[in-house]
Amino acid sequence: MNLIEQLARELNLKAHNVEATVKLIDEGNTIPFIARYRKEVTGGMDDVALRTLDERLSYLRNLEQRKEDVIALIGAQGKLTPELETQIREAEQLQRVEDLYKPFRKKRLTRAQKAREAGLEPLANMIIMQASAKGSALDAAAAYISEGTGFDTPEAALAGACDIVVETVAEDPECVADLRAFTHNTADIVVEATNADEATPYEPYYNYNEPLRKIPNHRVLAIDRGEREGKLRVRVNVNANEATARLGARWPRRHGVFAPVLDSAIADGYKRLMAPSLEREARAKLTVRAQTEAINVFAKNLEGLLSARPVRGARVLALDPGYRTGCKIAVMDETGKLLDHGVVYPTKPRGDVAGTKRELARLVKKDRVNTIVIGNGTASRETEEVVSEFIAEQAPDLRYTIVNEAGASVYSASELASQEYPDLDVTVRGAMSLGRRLQDPLAELVKIPPQSIGVGQYQHDLDQAELARTLGYVVEDVVNRVGVNVNTASASLLSYVSGITSTVAKNIVAYREENGAFTDRRELKKVPKLGPKAYLNAAGFLRIAGGKNPLDATSVHPESYPVATEVLKRAGVSASELERGGIPDIEKRAGSVAELAGQLDCGILTLIDIIDELKKPGRDPRDDAPEVVFSRSALSIDDLEPGMELKGTVRNVVDFGAFVDIGVHQDGLVHISKLANRFVKHPSDVVRVGDTVNVWVEKVDRDRKKISLTMVQGK
């Protein structure tokens, strides 16, 4: 089966779609471009399906290359048989290829190799095949004594032959595969404390065991961390007797003089060579599985955060709370432009509540503020109380919300922030970042490394390269799904646009600063290093509002302008209608999609996208996201009682549940069992970061500041 057929079978796709899609990928087209503008080619695959195909394609190509390498390496040793070559070529996993190659891999001089060099392989074969022999095994071994090699007695010769048998058994691909599956299916992970008297976060695992195949991913990561910190001792417990028996069953038994020798070699092979290797491999697989799931959860959480609904028209006063250094203030207009900044000291040690309220009143009036944003970090609760009092006393129409501070300090001290606002202090930049997260979460959060946004689980324990790669894909997909205003976007935002590198993004910003705003998508071709391929991949995602061609403000790709223009013509409307909100009934006016597609020589899926865009040009998919929850009065944990119904916002999703912000400065946990009145495989199947949910208080532990919530009424 060739690669295309295999991909089609595995992913349940049509072979011709797979072949054409692979060609597009190989030509250097991006996943967002292929997903959005080549639907006829792909059969309508979305970006998730395309990334799955791309990753599997890469794996299979690496697999094929490794097969060729292994065949060549074994062939160079003169040990490649037709049967072995067939086994290698038919292998469906890299692990199987490595198992087949293991007996031929060059390694340090082992006991078995020394024995082979001394001519003891024939004796080893006699043991393996249980050959008939006169007398005892030692009598047979006497014929293989070799002076000056260390095998100069029957006992030494027999021991050397056994070393060959041990290595042969331990490296047999079928034996390894069988014992690997046995270990996975039957072994337990056993955890003990290195110091049972020490209080640590890992106490639940001080005397813990669980089947390897059942242990949840979050426990794997917790145990791994405890082991790294020296608090836990971990081992894999396998029934060695049963494992040895399974191994022995794969070799011939004739009850001759070599039977006990073979039994001993098999037991030694498992205990000394196979068990440690398989147990390490089992632990490594657990960790990879857990990390992969954690990265996927992080990715889903990040997507929810980036896809949060912008709060348009908000004139924002952002407060970055603090104690000794005070609360930093940044006031911004609807576009995010800084109007004012300063510091107030409502909290200890100064406790200047009256002065803070006076300054808030002054700024709210002067800058026509309608929304206050408060960071959720240090001193947030005390700051919220002051803001709540101020609203009740002086500004009843004002509203406020709490935003996550994660990553704000990373951005404010970054080179990017110093380039954007060279004359502002880092504290002001941090407060501005909080306010802009409300106005346009996507545009602001792309300035921060995704790993620093804080919506993951055990994120610092994960494979950082894989985490960065996966999260980068998420940012890229969301940015291109939303689209970017090429005349206002930062270089950070532009760098995630399909086909645009960080260098080209900076060149776009430099070009518009030097030449003024872009008025036509074709002008992009004048940007240094933005070549034809980059233009093809990027143009549809870069929007120009108020330009020469109204289609430039839409997601219609320039290559489809002739089709879009003809659709408008048949509908009897001008492109200028797009600037007035679109043409909701264009489909009725222009005729049926099927007929138009045939007449205009355009694919149906592409035509549907064009018509949808003409109905509502430049539509922002984030407008479908839940609205931000605003408050006018503060709530504390002391106000909570079991049974109380509240509206909250999902802040984080983990393997065992979801953390929900209910406005008391301590997120409550909805355990996975309380997310729905049915079985839930993973919390992300029910909620995602940014969702607004109704919850009921189940239990409040005020001393430990823990809140248990449920999303199932009456549960």
Residue ranges and their predicted role:
Residues 281-299, 452-483, 598-642:
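Long, charged amphipathic helices and adjacent flexible linkers at domain junctions
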Residues 30-31, 42, 46-148, 481-624, ...:
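Accessory alpha-helical DNA-binding modules that contact the DNA backbone or grooves
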Residues 49-52, 59, 63-318, 322-423, ...:
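Duplex nucleic acid-engaging cores and interfaces of nucleic-acid transaction enzymes
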Residues 96, 100, 401, 407, ...:
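Long, charge-rich intrinsically disordered scaffolds of nucleic-acid metabolism proteins
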Residues 181-189, 319-323, 377-379, 403-410, ...:
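A glycine-rich phosphate-binding loop feature that marks nucleotide/adenosyl-phosphate handling sites
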Residues 12, 309-311, 476-510, 632-670, ...:
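C-terminal accessory/binding modules appended to enzymatic or scaffolding proteins
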Residues 140-157, 207-211, 225-228, 235, ...:
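Low-complexity, acidic/Ser/Thr- and charged residue-rich accessory regions of DNA metabolism proteins
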